[in-house]
Regions:
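Conserved "cap/hinge" positions at secondary-structure junctions
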Residues: 67-68, 210
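Short, surface-exposed, charge-dense and proline/glycine-enriched linear segments
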Residues: 49-60, 83-93, 123-138, 239-241
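Charged (often Lys/Glu-rich) extended helix/loop segments that serve as interaction or gating elements
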Residues: 97-244
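A cross-family glycoside hydrolase active-site/sugar-binding cleft signature
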Residues: 25-27, 58-62, 101-105, 136
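Feature marks short, surface-exposed loop/turn motifs that line or immediately flank catalytic pockets
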Residues: 30, 63-65, 108, 141
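Short connector loops at secondary-structure junctions
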Residues: 22-28, 60-63, 168, 172-178
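Active-site-proximal beta-alpha core segment in soluble small-molecule metabolic enzymes
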Residues: 1-56, 65, 71, 77-81, ...
Length: 244
């Protein structure tokens, strides 16, 4: 990337070599705050303004999608109206209608997939410690918690459908890595944040939601010689298809 304060230097290089800049790409993150989006659009259009040949602005990063109940999903109508006014004002001022590009991948597919694992082991470090659930899954399918403390919804599916009391657990993966923790503190992969779940037992199925984006594609597949997990698509008619 290029720091925005270096725009004048870039313009000099463009002029020196007779180049034309057709597209400006800025990375604004994946937030849901309309005010942040508006500020990012304004700053990005200021860059476009400096390159007369530019006709496309790509706001990289995409839309925030809430995976957890306390997370806010981007309101496309709210941010869209503000962005529209900024682009229209730019067109009136410069005579240039700018094409907007946004990367919507996560927004579309994040909550379309889930990991279905099995509880392999249970252990405890005593009254002053934690109760642990160990799965036959982990970094090999989802590195987001280990990398940046990402949060995912989780559920225990008791065998035989029985009802059990809730209990607080630290959920761990099966990799030989101290960082293979699936319940880190939010935004802190080094921290631990117990999750309240139905009481687990060895052999129970365990679901991890919100895994449709940046999980399979970003995972440590085949690490520790664990084979790559199959990916199954449930079609609209209920039929199952093995994708991978």
């Amino acid at each position: 990337g290029i720091w925005y304060k270096d725009a004048d230097e870039v313009k000099g290089i463009v002029e020196e070599y007779g180049l034309t800049v057709f597209r400006i790409h800025t990375h604004i993150g994946s937030g849901s705050d309309p005010e942040i989006w508006l500020k990012a659009v304004s700053l990005s259009l200021n860059l476009v303004r400096q390159f007369e040949g530019a006709r496309t602005l790509n706001l990289g990063g995409g839309y925030k999608v809430g995976r957890m109940e306390n997370e806010t999903t981007t309101d496309l109508q709210e941010i869209g109206e503000s962005m529209k006014m900024e682009f229209e004002a730019f067109a009136t001022e410069t005579g240039r209608e700018i094409r907007l590009e946004v990367e919507p991948g996560t927004y579309l597919v994040a909550n379309c997939c889930a990991i279905l694992a099995t509880i392999q082991d249970m252990t405890s470090t005593g009254e002053s410690g934690y109760d642990f659930i160990k799965l036959d899954s982990g970094m090999t399918e989802n590195t987001r918690p280990s990398m940046y403390g990402a949060q995912h919804p989780m559920v225990v599916f008791p065998q035989n459908g029985e009802t059990r009391a809730d209990k607080d657990y630290i959920v761990t993966g099966h990799c030989c890595e101290s960082g293979d923790i699936l319940t880190p503190a939010p935004g802190d992969p080094e921290g631990l944040a117990p999750r309240t779940l139905s009481e687990g037992k060895i052999g129970d199925l365990f679901g991890i939601g919100g895994t449709g984006a940046y999980c399979s594609s970003m995972s440590a597949k085949n690490y520790n010689s664990f084979p790559e997990s199959p990916e199954i698509m449930i079609r609209l008619d209920g039929q199952l298809s093995v994708m991978r």
